[in-house]
Amino acid sequence: DLHLSIRRQRQMCIRDSVGTATAANQVIYEYQKKGLIEKVKRDFYVVISMETKQPVLSRYQIGSNLFPDACITHHSAFEVFGYGSQVFYECYVATDKRFHDFEYDGVLYRHIERKPDMEVVQQGKIRVTSMEQTVVDSIRDFEKIAGIEEVIRCMMLVPGLNEQKVLECLARNNNGFLYQKCGYFFEEMQEEFHFSAKFFETCENGSSDAKRYLMKESQDNVFHKRWKLYAPVSLKGLIDKGVDAYDAMG
């Protein structure tokens, strides 16, 4: 029965039940009343631990199970891999399904558009963007998510990246400005990642011809001719200067 199913599968979310819809709704109601399950969102329930009175699923497990194609992305993906400089009370979920941002158990679940051919890996019971995909996505969207300083800090915690996979992510995005940004970021972080000259040549070839600004209202901007980019003299220097996490634009 449903109760036994819950007890045997403590790491599973309850989406559907057995029997008629009426019977299923009644069972769910009874389990909610007893505090055995909680509603996360419509048609999505999570088992509650009798010992801790907390959901048995982590925020990342919940997020990656919201829909069949859902996966954890951006700063939340850094957190899954253990490279989050800070823990946010937000969980970024990429999916083709539309949903309104919602809060459950003190965490705000935010919808992110799932890009075609996004590279997804399985980390335990969590579907999450690969480390390379996470870094490229975070560089692309730092003005919307986390801010440039936090992205830099997270990247500095990453022990290494596969440069070919980074290039594959860039090719899938097919965005000249993103090539400029990534060329600049990885050149500034060459000490950490040791990418080859071929990587930077590919970024140069993919870059837009337009001169762009990495950040707004920065007094430290200089023109980086190779990337046609107005950006700080030192990217890592931003950490010491304490740039506001959201005072940036892409």
Region spans (language model):
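Hydrophobic alpha-helical interaction segments
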Residues: 120-250
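Short amphipathic alpha-helical interaction segments
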Residues: 19-30
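Short gly/ser-rich loop at a beta-strand->alpha-helix junction or flexible surface loop bordering the NTP-binding
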Residues: 29-118, 226-229
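N-terminal alpha-helical segment
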Residues: 6, 55-56, 131
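A residue-level signal for conserved active-site and pocket-lining positions in enzyme catalytic cores
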Residues: 14, 77, 135
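Single conserved hydrophobic/aromatic residue that forms the stacking wall/gate
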Residues: 1-10, 14
